[in-house]
Amino acid sequence: MVECITPEAIFIGANKQTQVSDIHKVKKIVAFGAGKTIALWDPIEPNNKGVYATLKGHEAEVTCVRFVPDSDFMVSASEDHHVKIWKFTDYSHLQCIQTIQHYSKTIVALSALPSLISVGCADGTISIWRQNIQNDEFGLAHEFTIKKGFFYPLCLSLSKVEEKKYLLAIGGTNVNVFIASFILSDSGIEKCRVVAELEGHEDWVKSLAFRHQETPGDYLLCSGSQDRYIRLWRIRINDLIDDSEEDSKKLTLLSNKQYKFQIDDELRVGINFEALIMGHDDWISSLQWHESRLQLLAATADTSLMVWEPDETSGIWVCSLRLGEMSSKGASTATGSSGGFWSCLWFTHERMDFFLTNGKTGSWRMWATKDNIICDQRLGISGATKDVTDIAWSPSGEYLLATSLDQTTRLFAPWIYDASGRKREIATWHEFSRPQIHGYDMICVETVTDTRFVSGGDEKILRSFDLPKGVAGMLQKFVGIQFEEKSEMPDSATVPVLGLSNKAGEDDANEDDEEEEGGNKETPDITDPLSLLECPPMEDQLQRHLLWPEVEKLYGHGFEITCLDISPDQKLIASACRSNNVQNAVIRIFSTENWLEIKPALPFHSLTITRLKFSKDGKFLLSVCRDRKWALWERNMEDNTFELRFKNEKPHTRIIWDADWAPLEFGNVFVTASRDKTVKVWRHQKEPADDYVLEASIKHTKAVTAISIHDSMIREKILISVGLENGEIYLYSYTLGKFELITQLNEDITPADKITRLRWSHLKRNGKLFLGVGSSDLSTRIYSLAYE
């Protein structure tokens, strides 16, 4: 039935850590921590496919990722206290070959050199690990702590100064930069000790990086701090050290102080302050030296990337290039602020420099330049930074909406046409709109039409949104979606500074409403920028110009919304909220015509309802609940009232997480999925009693958390997708009381955590079916299934 399954897209955001990413200098592959996985991305791939794989293994948020220079190895660390060693199995995929379980607290810093890594732990210990050439495994060579009160490392940087002789720069919860030296011998680490404390910073040190100068024995060390300054330190060895006599009466200042020490009898080292770089308005997050030129890239919490280099005439370090945004204090992401940059990367490809940085929203921004003067912003990648809670295809199946606990609703669609209207050879998926940037965690979403959706956050109300003209034009241009009645669409949307509601940006907007929400009366021209796009929107456009205006709020629930569904005729909304009693565990029905509740509410359950599903013909409404019961409500098609028709008080032994209806041609059949690890099929029978009876059941090894049935039958069988709490996904065909396993998706392409939602697209493209997957591992994934 199914010939092959291909991951079409993986949308996942980067963790908010300063050492969360690195790039392989030869392969040009970016690895970054994304939740408890490591995402792999080729930023120069010509088709802009985005993340192509996620590496599983860690059990908590990944904090550090480093490629070992001049090798096929990568090192990662996590809040699970583990360090993992990875090795490339081919040009673009890695496999874990070693897990270091030595630590009892979070790993917060990593640095790597060929066959050598240093690890900083939140308990204050700093470890040096050496690789065994015979089996590629790393063994502990030395471990020490900085004896300076309460101190734990935040950043590390290793540098080889001579054969088998090394320096380790350490920054952390102290204003000083600590320098340790050691000798690598056949027997292990010798003479490892802290030899200098570089003074000057006024706050914690967050980033360190060594650079080898053209002259052998001459090095630069840069240090970035929360005091907003970057300091450069000159390191010289032996004959390069300034040994001129110093006047003992002369006042020693930080600017002329020399730190001198010996690594052994043959190697002397001198360190002095070289330069102070000022210009950033917030904490220094990440520093990167250029591969060949004397230039320094800095990413900071003021949402800027700046390239610094010495002036040819004066030698003073000046900013030669600034990228990012002009941020303002107190600005939120909803009003256009990125929330600062966390890590940055810098690499050269085909005589072009590429700058990468990740921000608060989990997205990656990319710029490219040939002359370091004019920069061209390139298409980056994006994704949620917290659990994806729900997904929903548009009725046409041409785009996918996803909600997340990161308080966003995102729209994903395939990039099919270029700006000139030509069809692209390979269609790739991208985030085309961010309809909702909210102040509450987002819980559920459902589309009403191709131009309207309803969502529920961690609040008591439902909100409805309409597609604006600018986004409609962009989707028509790049995706090929045709929308009717564009003239009636709102022009755009904005978020008031003190509000939660996306306001329509039209000239005739209600001024009283704007004043009530604390918004600005001026309507910015935010439609035109979208018409100028040559590719899918980038992060700054997603944050500012691609919101959808909110058209209605639906009230009635007493607690936070948990689930909702839209009737097939698009006339009704069914919703439920959190509850621990019968009074609040009711289903409320709203009309999409007048946005009013159709009373009475529907009581039956006693705990939180987990899923609501209308039958394909809209005549029945199915509810499943934490109380382990399911109920079936029959709809009066004339007045849209409901009556409890069928119920089962003991269908499962644990919570029922999900349910779905089979296609109408298969009969009156629905399927339930439960924490008791079972999937059960229920069919309507009129004899011996008019009821829904259990027709078949299948049990898995883990709790079943999501289920979805395709709208169409294939070879007179229904196609069922099943998701488990550990991220596994199964595909079954079902008929006549018999499950037949089609395939279990390969572990390499499935999520690393609970499947929160599975949804089949109604659309078939080029003989392929499309399955959307939302997961607690932060990812939204889209798979294509080629079938016979």
Curated annotation (Swiss-Prot):
Keyword presence, Cytoplasm: yes
Positions where Phosphoserine occurs in the chain: 492
Biased composition (Acidic residues): 507-517
Major site of localization recorded for this protein: cytoplasm
Molecular function via GO: microtubule binding
Compartment list: Cytoplasm; Nucleus
Pathway: tRNA modification; 5-methoxycarbonylmethyl-2-thiouridine-tRNA biosynthesis
SUBUNIT field: Component of the elongator complex which consists of ELP1/IKI3, ELP2, ELP3, ELP4, ELP5/IKI1 and ELP6. The elongator complex is composed of two copies of the Elp123 subcomplex (composed of ELP1/IKI3, ELP2 and ELP3) and two copies of the Elp456 subcomplex (composed of ELP4, ELP5/IKI1 and ELP6). The Elp123 subcomplex forms a two-lobed scaffold, which binds the Elp456 subcomplex asymmetrically. In the complex, ELP2 interacts with ELP1/IKI3. In each lobe, ELP2 is tightly sandwiched between ELP1/IKI3 and ELP3.
Other remarks on this protein: Present with 6090 molecules/cell in log phase SD medium.
Function: Component of the elongator complex, a multiprotein complex which is required for multiple tRNA modifications, including mcm5U (5-methoxycarbonylmethyl uridine), mcm5s2U (5-methoxycarbonylmethyl-2-thiouridine), and ncm5U (5-carbamoylmethyl uridine). The elongator complex catalyzes formation of carboxymethyluridine in the wobble base at position 34 in tRNAs. It functions as a gamma-toxin target (TOT); disruption of the complex confers resistance to Kluyveromyces lactis toxin zymocin (pGKL1 killer toxin). May also be involved in sensitivity to Pichia inositovora toxin.
Protein name, as recorded: Elongator complex protein 2
Phylogenetic lineage: Eukaryota, Fungi, Dikarya, Ascomycota, Saccharomycotina
